[in-house]
């Protein structure tokens, strides 16, 4: 039976879930983001461990240009006096299907929003109230709109 899912938050977790639902199910879904747009500033880098890469590869992350990602071989650890404590050989965790990866957060968000951006994403949707009804969940937003869904996934770090 087809269900209706509300995903709260258009960050990495929310957009990843939206892509997976779109690819593997016929459920109806919508991503609600409280901000007016996605932050795509070049900004900071993130690290993705092997298990997260395996999940992302299910939605074609492995097609991202190698110019936009980096596969470090080791990570060095330092104490507060800037003295090296040890290093970790990351290549030992890599496999043919997934490698430890670093990239800019904006690159990952750009990739994740490609297939869902206009049709499945609503901006400026600040939640005012969530009410559990008999067999549904009612979400009320600050803009006086609402949505009645079967499931709510909180993927917003400030929810």
Positions of the model-derived regions?
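Active-site flanking residues adjacent to catalytic metal/cofactor-binding acidic residues
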Residues: 8, 32-33, 155-156
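Glycine-rich active-site loop/strand segments that organize a redox cofactor
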Residues: 45
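Conserved Rossmann-like nucleotide-cofactor binding loop
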Residues: 13, 37, 159
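Conserved SAM/SAH-binding loop-helix junction
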Residues: 16
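Conserved N-terminal helical subregion
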Residues: 3-5, 22, 49-159
């Amino acid at each position: 039976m087809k269900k209706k899912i509300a995903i709260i938050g258009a960050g990495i977790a929310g957009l990843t879930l939206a892509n997976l639902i779109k690819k593997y199910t016929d459920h109806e879904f919508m991503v609600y983001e409280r901000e007016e747009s996605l932050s795509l500033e070049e900004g900071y880098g993130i690290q993705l461990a092997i298990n997260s890469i395996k999940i992302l590869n299910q939605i074609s992350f492995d097609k991202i240009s190698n110019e936009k990602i980096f596969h470090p071989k080791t990570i060095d650890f330092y104490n507060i006096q800037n003295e090296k404590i040890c290093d970790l050989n990351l290549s030992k965790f890599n496999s043919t299907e997934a490698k430890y990866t670093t990239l800019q957060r904006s690159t990952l968000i750009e990739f994740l929003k490609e297939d869902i951006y206009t049709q499945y994403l609503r901006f400026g949707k600040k939640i005012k109230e969530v009410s559990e009804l008999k067999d549904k969940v009612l979400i009320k937003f600050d803009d006086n709109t609402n949505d009645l869904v079967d499931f709510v996934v909180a993927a917003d770090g400030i929810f």
